[in-house]
Amino acid sequence: MITRKIKERRGRARRWLAAFLSSVFLISALTLGAAASSVAYPKGSVPTDVYLDGALVLDGDCVIYNSITYVPLRKFCNLFDDCTFEWNGKTGSATVKGEGGLTLIVRQNAAYIYANGHYFYTVGKVENWSGSLFVPIRPLARAFDVALTWNASRRAVELISPKGAPAVKWASYDSDDLYWLSRIISAEARGESLEGQIAVGNVVLNRVRSKSYPNTVYGVIFDRKHGTQFSPVSYGTIYNTPAESSVIAAKICLEGYTLSEDILFFMNPRIATSNWISKNRPFAFRIGNHDFYK
């Protein structure tokens, strides 16, 4: 009788152990499947790796999409600092704060990121793939003050850790340049895409650097050497409060981003009162309602 009970207990124990091991295996399989399942990257994207100080740190997490390298925001940030993340569903933006002093704001579908007062153009928009924000790597590297190079033989991005705190210094734009550049961009290109507004800002700054024009933003805008250069000066709209997007575009231009270092003119062919530019200057490209010329 006792032997029979012992056998029954052993049988129940074996069945329990088998069920337990089966459950553990199932849970492990599900966990591994979740970990191994890839993000639903867009068609045409190509995987690439990211190295930090010679070590592979992002393997299989990054892709080149439309000729731009995208990295997962959270994983990239945590490479350099102990960061906190706060998601705002209303604005579709993530606020990242690092112990090194960085405040970073990244908004889904935006073409720029905010970092300690700076506005860095991303070229490609911030993407949301499978519930995670992916950001072009170059502006993120600038935000963390990280050196970045492209290794053609490896077809990978190589990063070098910052010597100091992993955070760009707080922005300090020239107040006069920002004041007038944002106003001319807004007066000339309000309602245009951010890229179109940046291009107008590029024209002004390219003239500042040219020997053929005054060497200040204010001087270029109010230049009357060959007549009024910008119609908002005549209409008085240059003095209007600029649109928020124009202020951002001006800051991006002052960060040094340019669509072209050669463009010196632009016009809206639909409303232009003169075709001198189109007849005398080489055409460069069109963005929105504006044609740009060298």
Could you tell me what each predicted segment is?
Residues 165-294:
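Bacterial extracytoplasmic/cell-wall-associated proteins, especially those involved in peptidoglycan
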Residues 2-182:
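Primary recognition of N-terminal secretory signal peptides and signal-anchoring hydrophobic helices
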